[in-house]
């Protein structure tokens, strides 16, 4: 079902077996998103180009995610010729960007260009390679958010769902309702999407929904470790 000229609303039931809830997952049908995803997937893409591809994906996905979501105000401006009606993003409504460190940093620069007045709250999570469980080593979230704050979470890979669920718990416990949250992800997998169905009203914007995970918790076909590839480690 197409929700606009650009965004395809996917029925997750059709994509993920044995799932009873329909998530609000959007995969924008834009050729530039497909192009940069293909660049990022290619194992032969050098680190510097991989990072550029991920940044571009962050920009385009954020553009789509904020299309009908940012609060606006109507006013009148004076052009060089006459007065006319105008619409601005409401500067009094707070916006927060939460990059999941470290891979989320790859998306941050271009996302900030789309949302230049947004505050940035870093959240550092690391996944244990044996248990695949996340732990938090850096939390720059405020004790409480203004309840009207729009939150954009940057998590390039939605794999097992452990990290994003921890992030959602931290954010919602500070006064944010799920319907004010948008998740920007480059590649998503069924296990993470199943868990995120616990949050009604949450919307996820991703370049692709892949088949699943391997024994090490990596998305297949995926694009490898986004942090390692972006930072050359």
Locations of the language-model features?
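PRPP-associated nucleotide enzymes
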Residues: 1-233
């Amino acid at each position: 079902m197409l929700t606009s000229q650009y965004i395809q609303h996917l029925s997750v039931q059709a994509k993920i077996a044995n799932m009873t809830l329909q998530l609000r997952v959007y995969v924008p049908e834009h050729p530039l998103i497909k192009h940069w995803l293909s660049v990022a997937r290619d194992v032969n893409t050098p680190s510097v180009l991989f990072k550029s591809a991920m940044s571009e994906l962050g920009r385009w996905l954020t553009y789509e995610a904020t299309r009908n979501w940012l609060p606006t105000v109507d006013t009148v401006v004076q052009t060089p010729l006459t007065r006319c009606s105008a619409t601005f993003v409401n500067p009094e409504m707070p916006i927060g960007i939460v990059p999941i460190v470290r891979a989320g940093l790859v998306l941050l620069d271009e996302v900030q260009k789309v949302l230049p007045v947004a505050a940035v709250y870093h959240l550092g999570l690391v996944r244990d390679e044996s248990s695949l469980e996340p732990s938090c080593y850096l939390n720059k979230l405020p004790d409480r958010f203004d309840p009207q704050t729009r939150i954009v979470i940057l998590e390039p890979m939605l794999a097992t769902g452990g990290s994003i669920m921890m992030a959602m718990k931290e954010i919602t416990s500070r006064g944010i309702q799920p319907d004010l949250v948008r998740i920007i992800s480059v590649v998503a997998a069924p296990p993470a999407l199943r868990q995120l169905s616990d949050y009604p009203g949450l919307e996820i914007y991703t370049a692709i929904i892949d088949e699943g995970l391997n024994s090490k918790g990596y998305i297949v076909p995926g694009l490898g470790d986004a942090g390692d590839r972006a930072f050359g480690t």
